[in-house]
Amino acid sequence: MKKTFAILLLLAVMKMSAQVVPTFFPRKFLLEHFTSANCNQCPMGMKYIVEYLDRQTTPYIWVSHHAVYGTDEYTIPASNAIAMNYLGMNSVPSVVFNRSKQDGLLVIGAWDIENLVVEDDTVAEASVMIEHQYDAATRRLDITVSGQVANMDRTAYLLSILIKENGLVGKQEDAYCSWKGRKWKEYMHPRVVRDFVTATFGDTVRVENQAYSYSV
């Protein structure tokens, strides 16, 4: 799986275009989940996330970074850069909404998580559409990203594109297992961030009907 993934990335191509329109757009909230296979409390953190998302009607994007708590087979430098260098994070499990910090709060359950999301009804300044084509014979992935932005003075935006993989089965420490005299269990890791197509914190794009292309 790792070999296939690496080859796929080498052949990926991304193109982006955008145009200005006089409107705003419904917003999806970004949920960045920080976890580690070495963290025995992280399965409980996952339980709270799922309970919260099961009640949501607002569209969301969920990605999981394996970071902070040592390294495991899914840890990448970009995830640690976001968690520790940008957010100042020093423990997992942790959740960040729309990449903004909530200082001084200890979140312990799904109800508390819900109370922290204050931007669900905020309109977005841009829309994003992603299309892709995959050629299994050549392992080539073509990604096309298009969008519209609100007609306002701001003409430059940061565009972040990452690749995530769902349903990865691997080892996971679990506090419940330790009570049973075992350290590890087989665990399904969802929505794991595997790599960034753009720079970790996004590439600056200007929207005067321009197109951008990337090869990685």
Language-model segments: what does each one mean?
Residues T58-V216:
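Short, conserved sequence motifs used for protein processing/export or organelle targeting and
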Residues L10, T23, L31, D54, ...:
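A generic structural signal for short, solvent-exposed coil/turn residues
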Residues V20-I61, H65:
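Local sequence-structure signature of Cys/Sec-based thiol-disulfide redox active-site neighborhoods
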Residues I7-L8, Q41, G104, T200:
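A broad, structure-centric signal for solvent-exposed, well-ordered loop/edge residues
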Residues M1-F25:
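Bacterial Sec-dependent N-terminal signal peptides
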